[in-house]
């Protein structure tokens, strides 16, 4: 029978060995799972996955992401351009309405400041 005062010494002796073995025990189920990973199932693998099918899927995924990103950038640029256009039109309307020129009026369809007498564009 083991004495109780030897228990802390045994714990100090086996604890480092147990901690070193824990990662090996942790990895064993992961290695077993990777062997049974099939097409269409959700599997996560770390390391060298060099089969051509996964490379093709990664390439297609990257290509789709690039196209989506390009379209998103085009849409953002268009929205920004429209916003800037409307912002300039509001500023031009304010300038036209505050103009000292009594013949200046704002044409909402063309978003320009025009002369009442000639119909030509003016810069107030």
UniProtKB/Swiss-Prot annotation:
Entry keyword annotation includes Signal: yes
Region (Disordered): 47-69
Keywords, alphabetical: Signal
Any single Pfam family the record assigns to this protein: DUF1283
InterPro entries: DUF1283
Top-level division of the source organism's lineage: Bacteria
Signal peptide: 1-32
Family the entry assigns: Belongs to the UPF0482 family.
Name of this chain's protein: UPF0482 protein YPK_1977
Organism of origin: Yersinia pseudotuberculosis serotype O:3 (strain YPIII)
Lineage: Bacteria, Pseudomonadati, Pseudomonadota, Gammaproteobacteria, Enterobacterales
């Amino acid at each position: 029978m083991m004495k109780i005062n030897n228990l802390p010494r045994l714990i100090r002796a086996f604890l480092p060995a147990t901690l070193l073995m824990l990662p090996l025990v942790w990895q064993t189920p992961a290695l077993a799972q990777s062997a049974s990973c099939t097409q269409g199932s959700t599997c996560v693998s770390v390391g060298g996955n060099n089969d051509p099918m996964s490379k093709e899927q990664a390439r297609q995924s990257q290509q789709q992401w690039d196209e989506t990103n390009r379209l998103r950038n085009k849409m953002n640029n268009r929205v920004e351009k429209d916003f800037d256009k409307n912002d300039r039109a509001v500023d031009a309307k304010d300038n036209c309405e505050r103009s000292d020129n009594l013949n200046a009026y704002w044409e909402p369809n063309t978003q320009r400041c025009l002369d009442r007498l000639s119909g030509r564009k003016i810069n107030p």
